[in-house]
Amino acid sequence: MAPEARASPRLLLRAALLLLAALLPVASSAGPPVDHPLKPRHVKLLSANMGLKVTWDPPKDATSRPVEHYNIAYGKSLKSLKSIKVNAETHSFLIKDVEKEVPNKPLRMRVRASDDRLSVAWKAPRLSGAKSPRRSRGFLLGYGESGRKMNYVPLTRDERSHEIKKLASESVYVVSLQSTNSQGQSQPVYRAALTKRKNAEEDELDVPEDISVRVMSSQSVLVAWVDPLVEKQKRVVASRQYTVRYREKGESARWDYKQVSNRRALVDSLIPDTVYEFAVRISQGERDGKWSASVFQRTPESAPTTAPENLRVWPVNGKPTVVTVSWDALPESEGKVKEYILSYAPALKPFGAKSLTFSGHTTSALVDGLQPGERYLFKIRATNRRGQGPHSKAFIVAIPTTSSTEASVQPNGRDNGKPEKPQQPSSSAPKVAASSQHMPPAKNVKDALSDLKNKIQTNGVAPGRTQLHSKVGELDPQSTEVTGEEELDSLENPRSSRLETLNQKQPLRVPSRSGHGALAPGRTPARAGLPVLSRKEGMDRRGPSLDPHPHPRVEPSASSAYHQLSSTDNDSVDRKEDDQAGSPDPKAASSGSSPKNPGRSRPTSAPSRHAASNMLRDKSRVHPGTKAASSSTSRQSHSSTSEEDSSAQPSRHFPLHRGSSTSPLSRGWKDRQDTHASSSHTTSRTASSSHPSALTEGSEEEDGGADSDRAAEDTIRRAEATAQIQQTRPGLGHFSLIRNKPFTPHSRNPNRFPRLRGPRLQPSVSPQSTSASKVLTRSPSLPASHTRPGSDVYGDGEDEEPLPATVINDRTPSYPRHPISGSSDTLRRGPQRGASLYRKEPIPENSKAAGADVPPGGRSPLSSKAQGFQQSTTDEGAPQTSPASTSRQPSPARPPASRSQPSPGSTVPRRMTPDRSSELSSSQSKDRSLSQPKLSVAHAGHDHPHTANSRGVLPSAPQNQNEGAQSTYEDNSTEIEGPDSRTPTHSARAKDTTPPILKPRQVGSQSWSSDNRPQPSQAGASERPIRPGSTHPRAQVPGRAGVQATSVKKVSPSKRPLPLESQQSVFAEEEEENEGMLKGKEDSLSTSVKKWPSSSSPRDKYADRNLDKDKAAIGLLVQEENTVPGRRPPGSPAIASHPSTRHQPRNPATASPIANTHSWPRYTTRAPSSYSSTTPMLSLRQRMQRRFRTPVSRQPPPPRPVLTPGYNGRPNAEENIPPGSIGKPNGQRIINGPQGTKWVVDLDRGLVLNAEGRYLQDSHGNPLRVRLGGDGRTIVDLGGTPMVSPDGLPLFGQGRHGKPVASAQDKPILSLGGKPLVGLEVVRTTTQVPTTTMPPSTTTTTVPPTTTLPPTTTTTRRTTTTRRTTTTRRPTTTTRATRRTTTTTTTPEPTTPSPTCPPGTLEHRDEAGNLIMGSNGIPECYPEEDDFSGLEIDTALPTEEDYVVYDDDYGLETTRPPTSTMPSTTAATPKVVPEQGTVSSFPEEEFDLAGKRRFVAPYVTYLSKDPAAPCSLTDALDHFQVESLDELIPNDLTKNDLPPQHAPRNITVVAMEGCHSFVIVDWNKAIPGDVVTGYLVYSASYEDFIRNKWSTQTSSVTHLPIENLKPNTRYYFKVQAKNPHGYGPVSPSVSFVTESDNPLLVVRPPGGEPIWIPFAFKHDPGYTDCHGRQYVKRTWYKKFVGVVLCNSLRYKIYLSDNLKDTFYSIGDSWGRGEDHCQFVDSHLDGRTGPQSYVEALPTIQGYYRQYRQEPVSFGHIGFGTPYYYVGWYECGVSIPGKW
């Protein structure tokens, strides 16, 4: 209005004047007459859209003279005025008829037609402004079909366009437009338009067809369907949408909806085990189609997703050590609860956790045996048949203090040790008994077992091993589990009461037993849980208390206390195993402990035997419990306890051995002073009972199936005889056996356990009655059996403490009590042993002990150090087992030897008397041949401290340094246990020598040992062999104990690391065991050994400490070896004698263990390799490790280089164990992993493990659970999807998502922007020199990792031991900080990493073990079919790196992968093999192929590749870590309702040289505190960047590949974080210029053979978003196709007969994406994906492949056949043939 007023001032002015004159109010007649009219005030005239607006205010005196109305007169002159009356309430008026003329017509009218609408646009008329008399006030739009009535639409004066909708298609419409004002309308403007023909979309929308619902998980399904419109190959309609509706089955359920734009939808957040109804409809625009017919699908049952609520704990009146626990039952929606697992631990001792298992109907329970004055944390979780649920929130309860010593003693293994043995037993007994009494017998046993299990887990016992044992037990009556279970059931009540009574009667024994049990957990920690405790308790009590109170089985309390100690390390692992095993495991454990008690109490040989066997079974199982028992046992068992503790910790790695060892050690060192005296008693007692059983077990395990069994039988016979002599002892013996078992796969085997039972009892008796020397003597005669005892003592025994028990016997004959005392200390150290560091500290003590031991043993073979270790063991264990050497024969002697051996390596010579050594040696060679004779080792270690040392050494030397190291650990464990029964001295020493490395290693070794039966003694398995031969291998345990004694204070720290290491060991062992079985003992051992060092090497401070000790031990060993090279079996230096060991595989067995010990400490896996001659398995393993970062994978090809004396440090005599000799055929299967590596499928634990014992993870970072398929041969996941074919081939993807969360095998992981690396394998770029000076008095020769072992021994092929520390490791979590992770290849050369052969091939080595290089400086390689895959050598680095085990149930310990095979390379920087590719901020070549300079910036990282290799995004992504969802998605999204507050940092562009088509954008995680569930990655080319047009992609991890990039083009990238509450800030953008295109993609090599033949192919957009070219390569496959998709080369096998057929994307689990290489699934016609249940697969004709890189075959596939469907092709693995 204002503008218009200005526009026509004259008109307005004039009108205003006229209006003012005419605007007159008319007053009412009321009131006095007034002469003058009322004048309105503030009259204004304004221009409006439709005319003139007049406004005014009422007159001043309007109140006194009310206004009736206003008159408005207006006109262009006073002559032509018009007047209007307005009522009195109005103060404004609009005058409309003020225009002069009608407006002009609109201009430039245009009409555009579509199918059902017209768009009209125009310009304003001329002269339509406010001044114009023809101004327009609006428009009138008319439209209608020609010849019909028009429809009119008024429009405002400002509109210039309009759309007419809902018109008929294919019709002619007339459109008119007029402008209007107050004078009228302008002339119309007409236009005619024809609407277009409507599309078929007008027809009714199609109904989706072929709706399929694929189960993705228990809570998500993938719904897919076919759109008939798209299927008819019509065009794809962009506006087409699809809606999926779903609800629980039932009419009353509410529908939920999900709308998507593609033809598949992932429906998540479903309820497990529920039937859902699904339907789909198509929508387009505003129209919706009809719903399809419903499809029903049941979601599979899943593990509970919630924890039981309302956990409450309160004390029981009048019972200060008892609490009542109650909880709410889990809702039915979580599935039928099978059992509840209650975990509790002292608040200040988180590793002392125990767990009890209750039936699914139970909601309350009594928990007994708590420590007064302690604060306990209680947690509970539920399990159903699909797995375990999460833990509940912790409930903390303070136990009231009480004057009762019992209560306090029970929890403390140490306190128990201090009191008189009987007192402790009673204390222990109350604990165990109480639990039994308070619960129903079954429940009690079960609880006790679970407690033990928990302890074992806590102590780091590998659940896998335990579980294996338990499973084996279940399968085979002989196996510990079956026996344990049966006994549990049958003896549940009796046993319970018996346990209680026994515990009361023989509390001290329990510790000793416990120690053994701790050892046992490595093997079958779960089963060992309680039974081991009992047995161990019995053993311990029997050892010292055995004579006085055979009954004080009450020890179980002590044992449980020990368990607590050890449980820190073992329990978690064992618990996991137990959990996996289920309640049976706990049951077995408790039953085992019960039988043990009965066995002890029973005088008859038969009962003893039974008890022994039970104990054996139990031992492995009770390991944790054993610990507890040891605790109770207090210090008869103090040393015993220590030993057990240490053993238990080792147990984590080595189910029983380690745990047992750890427990006794920790206990021992704690109560060390107290225990010296009682220790000697315990040792003596334990030794006799422990040794035989250990012997039996060791031999059984070591030998593999047959050897083990044979040894077990022999041992049993002896044990029986002995059992009769020492009825109570048998339990010990059994316990020993059990310990051994965990280390050897065989021990897992069902047949092993039965034998073990008999022999254990007998050996127990025998050792008790006989001195170590006697046992040793027997050992030769009874190689397997004797070895078993010795071996048991040594290998399993290490974990077991039975060997120490045997030592006790020994101490009776020859060792001074004070040495036994040392043993005790060593035992205490045992727990430390797990953490090698303790070894260092104990070394001084060890040296003292060693000195004492050596003099008693007279086994000079050990270097002064070794002797020191021995002596230390003997000294410490002297009180326990005065005759350390004698004790060797029994468990006690052996533990000292065991420890000795681990401790310096001199331990190898350790307690073996020269004759003993020879015996051992001969035995060992025998065993080795049989089963990597643990026997030999045992023999070597039987007689004297030397023997013990040699025994410890023996296994190592013969089999492998690796194995030796493992065996050392095992020995440590054994010793730990041994200290209880026998001399902790050895234990300490061995422990000192190899606690850190050995412990973890032992487990692996034991595992491998099964493969290399002979080798168990050496590396765990190796220990066993020693054990059988003599207790000396056990002596190693004492060595550890010695170490512990020396480092009593360190024990606690050591213990902690130990658990982790133990756990690692367990995994490694387990894997090794399987692997070893398939690959060969040597190989297996080698891996395990290697594994050990890495796990215990200075990954953490403890590990470092251990490393030092190990180094020292190694030095000792080397010295000893040098001193007594010929005598190697008795005590040759681990390192020095390794080469010689190789030459003298059998004899050097003793030395070998020593070497192992050293080598472990030094982290020179190679050293163990040299042992390989003695222990072929070890060398094999070493080789594998060398080859592979993850030694486990290395295992597969033992045969080829085994015989070469210098091959990778393996001895020539390296023996391969035929696949058939697998220790536990039922429990583990070895399969071919990616890149020629070997993986172990552990059916007992339901895991897939690599050589390091790490388990394969699912997409959530949890262990991938597997089970046996319907045909009894195929391995499937819990959903029934086949994972491993009956022939041992993995069927799961080997792409970057199919591997464990870790780096690709030989590819460095990028750590960009300082991002920490997490995963199974985290590589430490800095490698620690393994050499450490040994604390023992023996001079320790530190052997730098770079130095090769003495010439006599084969070069230790240890690559630099770069440890991969997992973030979980507390001591030192090293993240791979360097961008460039280099793996050192293990080459004979000590200092420099050498080039490695490509995957699938192996390097050639000369007789000296040196790489044979071609003229071009590249190693000569041969096909992988041979012994190992080429990868084994490739990365030594991972071998040494620490690995973290992620599963909660398993101990969270970083295990160091086996040390690389590089003999003694400088610690070093791993070198990236060209094949693996290097990572650098600068390209290797400054210019690209077109001569253009490559783009360089601070945020750009280049990956190098072989110029001849194609560009593969798959390969590039292998450099990136796949993070688990646990890390990516926070647990509690509700704690923060804000969007991310910070932009992603450190954005890095990773490019591959020579590849322009893709880059990978990487960035750092969000700032802590920001809740981030995903990221948006923006990318734009330069042109798009200028126009601010960005493409976005989502990523759930911190890197994303950007594909389809053009050559020589600048791109910009930025990243934004998001969460459910919104998006965070966007990061600054970074730019990158791609390199020029490669004009030589398809080339003809000099030979003229076309590498690729390109041609186009059809593609179906419904299955793939990518299209492109495919390059066909001639291979032995039917058709091999490399497909260039999205400009990035991918690989696929195309099985179509016609290569021009339609290409379907290679589906991943979502059914989309081309990122996986695999064979096309014959069942899905090219659309690959997982099957919900294998049983649902029909039998049809299809393609399948049996072995990796084998031609595809055609035949019957499906359920019921060996081939369910075609497996995956390994992505990222170089394709066979030349590229």
Swiss-Prot record:
Its GO biological process annotations read: cellular response to hypoxia; positive regulation of cardiac muscle cell apoptotic process; positive regulation of protein phosphorylation; regulation of protein transport
Region of interest called Disordered, as start-end residue ranges on this chain:
400-442, 459-1108, 1120-1227, 1330-1401
Q: Where is the Fibronectin type-III domain?
A: 33-126, 103-203, 207-302, 307-402, 1543-1637
Give the superkingdom in one word: Eukaryota
Induction description: By ischemia.
Start-end of Low complexity biased regions: 423-437, 629-640, 676-694, 879-904, 1085-1097, 1330-1389
Glycosylation sites noted in the Swiss-Prot or TrEMBL record? N1546
Q: Which GO cellular component does the record give, naming just one?
A: plasma membrane
Q: Which residues carry this modification: Phosphoserine?
A: S651, S699
Compositionally biased intervals (Basic and acidic residues): 534-554, 707-720, 1098-1108
* Location of this chain's protein in the cell: Secreted
Ranges of Polar residues composition bias in the record:
400-413, 493-506, 557-570, 590-607, 763-784, 861-875, 957-971, 1003-1020, 1147-1159, 1166-1177
What CDD domains does the entry give? FN3
- Cleaved signal peptide residues: 1-29
Keywords of the record, alphabetical order, are: Glycoprotein, Phosphoprotein, Repeat, Secreted, Signal
Query: Briefly, what is this protein's role?
Result: May be an activator of G protein signaling.
Please identify the protein, giving its name as recorded: Fibronectin type III domain-containing protein 1
Q: Tell me the lineage of the source organism.
A: Eukaryota, Metazoa, Chordata, Craniata, Vertebrata
